[in-house]
Structure formats: C-alpha cells, structure tokens
C-alpha cells in the first residue's frame, strides 16, 4: 500500500451528478473568493469514466424535468455550468430553442453531465476514476484517513482529508425471488438494460422460435423497457409472434403527477418545510401524499405511447377475425395486473429444472446460458396461480440507497456517530427532531422469508430486503438513529467532541430532506448549501 503525503481539504466518495454539482460550486467559489481555504479536493469514483444511467439511454427517451433544474441555474443563473452554457459551448443553443421544449432528451442530458464533469476537472477539481474507497479511520491532526484501491489492480493508497462528502448513489433493488439469478446472463435490472439486452438476444438468435420476455415493475423504467424490448424483438426472425409480458402488482399502470402545484414539492423551499417538520409520522404522511410524483408511476406521454401499441394489437386482432386475414407478426405486449411472483426456476434444453440456489456459483451461472425460466405467478385478487416459460427476465424495481451504511459502519470513524459493525439498520433523522432527544432502538425482528404474496415489489423498499436464504429464526436488529443538519452534515453523537472533520451525505436523505433529495431537482441549490457550510467552518475559525 502506498501513502500520499498530501492532505486534501475535501475528499468525495463518488463522482456522479451530486458531487459534480459540488465540484461546480467549489470552482465558482474559488473564482469569487481567492482566499477560500478549501482548494485541494479529490473525488474518488469507481467507474473508469463518468457514466450516468448508461443502461437506460434508450432511443427517444426524454428527461422528466426542465433543463433549468440543472447543476447550477437555480443557485447561480449566470454560472458557467448551466445547461444553457453547455448548449452555447456546443453551438446548439438556437437549435435547442427551435425545438420548442424545455425538456431535453436523456441522451443530451447525459452528455451535459459528462461535459460538466470534465469542466470541473479542467478548473482544478481532481478525480480518481477506477478507484473505490474501502476504509475511513481517524487520522492525525484532525483529519480522516481515507484508504482507496484501484479497481483493476487492487493497489491500495492511503490519503488524509480534512472533510468528507459521501455521495454513493443508488443500487438496484433486487426482489427476494430474483436474488439467486442476479448473475444469470439473461436476467438484468433496468439500470443495466441497454448494456446487456443486445447480448441477451444475440444468444437466443439460433432458436428460431418465438421468444417471451418478462418485465417486472410498473414505473417509468419498466414502461420504457417494455416498449424498447418490443421494438428490438421485431427485428428477430421467428416462426411465430414474440411476446413481452409486463408483470405489475397494481390493477393498472398509473400516471405520474407532474402538475404545477404538485411539482412544488421538489422546490428548495419544500426542503426547508420538510426538514423542519418535527415528526416522522408527518413526514411519512407527506411522502405518501406525493408518492405519485415519483414512485411506481409512468409519464403520461409514455403511457399514451404504450396504450397506442396495445390498442393497435386489439385492432389487428379484430380485423383478422372479421376478414380471416392473418395478423401482422409484430411482437405482442401483455400487461398482467395484480400479479405476484411466487417462484422462478431455470429449465434446461431437455426440460429439466434447476434450483435458483445453484446459480449463485460461477459454474452455475456459466452453465445456465442455454436455459430458459419457469415462473410461477399468483393473481392477487383471485388467488389463481399460473406457470409461464420465459427466455429473458428484466426487472425495473427501482433503487435502494442504504448500501453506504455497510461501508460506513465498519469504518474507524463510525463510532463518533454511535454506529458499530453490529448496527443492522440506520434511521436518518433531521436535527430538528433532536428537541425530543436522541433515540436508540433494539428490537427483535422475524427474519423468516417473506411470504410469496409479498415477495415482489414494484417500488423499491427503503432498505434491502432480508435474503430468502437467511435462517428462519428471530434475530436481534440494532437500529441506530443518525442525525443530519439542514446543510446535510452528519452530526456526531452526544458528547462527541474529538471528530474535527465534517462528514456530509448527498442523495440518500429523502427521509430528512424530502422527495427531491434523490433526484436532480435541487442539485445546484444543495451543492451551494454544502459549500457554504464548509466555508463557514473556516470563517468561524479565522
């Protein structure tokens, strides 16, 4: 392991949109205030290059927000990091205006983020791509020792930081029934869809028979993937019609509420109101009220496109019945409402079935390349069970944002926040709740596998689900409250005065800062607030 003698003023975990916005706010601060003390910064990113949802960069996919909710406009409209600055630098400003829409394509917004990522580096922000942080410990002289490693070579490096920002992003939420199949070459979360679907279908070309694809989920990603899969299947020769089954637990797909009044829940002012609400019960009620702005819903334009396809199928079937003319061979989309997945098994070319547990090994995953799947589902209203064979399973079940806890609780600095390796659940609370005193909970939790009827989710849970292979006995879960300031700083436990560095969280604080926290809506404003809080420390100590 090598050691870097440089002490960084700020080290960031991750270099996605949240920390790019931080980098942009920092470089603007450097321009405005040459005496600003936070100058030497480093962000550590696991990917080899900047990537933003590459698995969902689908043809014609649109963003769900105005371009004005970019990395900087709501904070500093004349910032060099705005979407308009990007368009101007790319000589597309007039062309974009002529489009007559404030909503860019997902491809263009991804390119904007990549442009901004490079621009902050050009302006002095250091980034280590292809590396990941593996340890955080107390360092000398009021610093944090940060140990990271090269993902490819596994070489480790030790550095020191005066302050730390953790912006880990989300990780795919995997339903229990799919856990054994995560390494299967023809099973994928929507986050990897565009990167994998080509190889999946290429591996099935030799079959020359109708293919059947299952898509699990009822949100925007599930709907987009369903349409894209149908379009791709149309170019694959077959002796019959390919089928795409969209499995949803609801009775129907629901539209997202993007009306002007509902959209105000994503305004920066709503962050203040949410944070100052001194009751978890009330915050949960607000979340439930506005759930249809973001969770398990589909943009009305996408719904219309999907329904038009299904209506066309019904029209073709009716014309065929009346005229006795064969229907077009276009792939068929079937939406299956009130559907719960009970079990999945793989089936070999000879019809033999293989338990999912065997696929957890590399050998099992390799041996499964020519297998299909048998899925048993249950209609949640009638209780009727059915069995269907599939060639590909895609799941758009959202993301969970608690993976950072596993790293953090095993670090040397976790003790300053009352977190230990035995902590199995962290509950984020706003510092406004401290009026009632800190809370610490230990309770018994039944960790037996969940029942089949509740094993699949269309909306990601707020924490990872219990593994279906866990022991069916009660286990003690230690739940620890972790408090955040309005400026996103993790607050040390009561009586803790030995930790001088500040630790900030980004993009995982929906429970404390509201619905917009995991989205792009407030990135620019939030970055400005964090940088201002960092600056206040140095001003107050001057």
From Swiss-Prot:
It is an enzyme of class 1 (oxidoreductase). GO terms for molecular function: monooxygenase activity. Its EC number is 1.14.13.196. GO terms for biological process: biosynthetic process; intracellular iron ion homeostasis. L-ornithine N(5)-monooxygenase; part of the gene cluster that mediates the biosynthesis of coprinoferrin, an acylated tripeptide hydroxamate siderophore. The biosynthesis of coprinoferrin depends on the hydroxylation of ornithine to N(5)-hydroxyornithine, catalyzed by the monooxygenase cpf2. The second step, the acylation of N(5)-hydroxy-L-ornithine to yield N(5)-hexanoyl-N(5)-hydroxyl-L-ornithine is catalyzed by a not yet identified acyltransferase. FAD binds at residues 45-53, 64, 518-520. Pathway: Siderophore biosynthesis. It catalyses: L-ornithine + NADPH + O2 = N(5)-hydroxy-L-ornithine + NADP(+) + H2O; L-ornithine + NADH + O2 = N(5)-hydroxy-L-ornithine + NAD(+) + H2O. Keywords: FAD, Flavoprotein, Monooxygenase, NADP, Oxidoreductase. Residues 447-472 have a biased composition (Low complexity). It comes from Coprinopsis cinerea (strain Okayama-7 / 130 / ATCC MYA-4618 / FGSC 9003). Residues 443-472 are annotated as: Disordered. Substrate binds at residues 69, 263-266, 294, 521. This is L-ornithine N(5)-monooxygenase. Binds 1 FAD per subunit. Belongs to the lysine N(6)-hydroxylase/L-ornithine N(5)-oxygenase family. Its cofactor is FAD. Homotetramer. It comes from the Eukaryota. Gene3D superfamilies: FAD/NAD(P)-binding domain (3.50.50.60). The keyword Protein transport does not apply.
